[in-house]
Amino acid sequence: MNIQYIVECLALLREKKPLVVNITNYVVMNNTANALLALGASPIMAHSQQEMAEMMSFSGALVINIGTLDSVWTPRMHFAVEQANLNNKVVVLDPVGCGASQLRTQVARQIAEAANKLIIRANASEVIALAGENAQSKGVDALDSSDSAVGAACYVAQKYQCSVVISGETDYIVTQDAQYKLNNGHAMMPFVTGMGCTHTALTGAFAAIGDESGVVATAVLGVAGEIAAEQSAGPGSLQMNLLDTLYQLDEETLTRRLKLTVNA
């Protein structure tokens, strides 16, 4: 894994325009769809069980976000994972609020257990809760630092044979054979709702075209968010500027600004 590979993945995504199936929450559907489009992918928000087998037969990846979880959505998520497995597609799980309630923790663990090809993108508290440890969370927001969740991420990666992306002031990605640390992004980003959900959706887009998609998506969003925040007066303008920056992000800028450490 190196910066050149990340640059090549961005170019390939824009060329291939992969279709990403999203079962995501009501709060962020617009944000994540626009971010995927701005980057160059093709989003579809598919929540009907009747069409899921068809959708997963020709999509590139499945993103599951449990942010507005209920008894109607849960069986649909499980069925979607079954179809992703049948079609050998990657499942990207965002266990929003894992640890905040027994329901969220239980469903997140069930999905993680069921998926054959899995990436988990979460904040530190969610990762710690997924590992079965005591996490500090306030609703869906993390009170733990990303640094404190690396050990839990290693455990989760081994338990579910997956990659784990920890979002925070410093981002960490734990895979089966490596650890990565990225120091991009901006302190304003957590003040925009759904920024982590966007991170998850972009991970799904890159999962549709290559390996190590957690690292690639984290790099792209971190650099884009950093640039967008520098041009923004506050969270409102950051939302708009992020879409523009994802659309305009070029290889030279990504290469110059990326702060990546391998085997951190």
Curated annotation (Swiss-Prot):
Keyword rRNA processing assigned: no
GO molecular function: ATP binding; hydroxyethylthiazole kinase activity; magnesium ion binding
Residues engaged in binding substrate: M45, G194
Catalyzed reactions: 5-(2-hydroxyethyl)-4-methylthiazole + ATP = 4-methyl-5-(2-phosphooxyethyl)-thiazole + ADP + H(+)
Signal peptide positions (record): none
Pathway: Cofactor biosynthesis; thiamine diphosphate biosynthesis; 4-methyl-5-(2-phosphoethyl)-thiazole from 5-(2-hydroxyethyl)-4-methylthiazole: step 1/1
Keyword ATP-binding: yes
Pfam families recorded: HK
Binding site for ATP: R121, S167
Gene3D superfamilies assigned: 3.40.1190.20
Keywords linked to the UniProt accession: ATP-binding, Kinase, Magnesium, Metal-binding, Nucleotide-binding, Thiamine biosynthesis, Transferase
InterPro entries: Hyethyz_kinase (IPR000417), Ribokinase-like (IPR029056)
GO biological process, one term: thiamine diphosphate biosynthetic process
Enzyme Commission number: 2.7.1.50
Cofactor: Mg(2+)
Similarity comment: family membership: Belongs to the Thz kinase family.
Function comment: Catalyzes the phosphorylation of the hydroxyl group of 4-methyl-5-beta-hydroxyethylthiazole (THZ).
Protein name from the UniProt record: Hydroxyethylthiazole kinase
Gene assigned in the entry: thiM
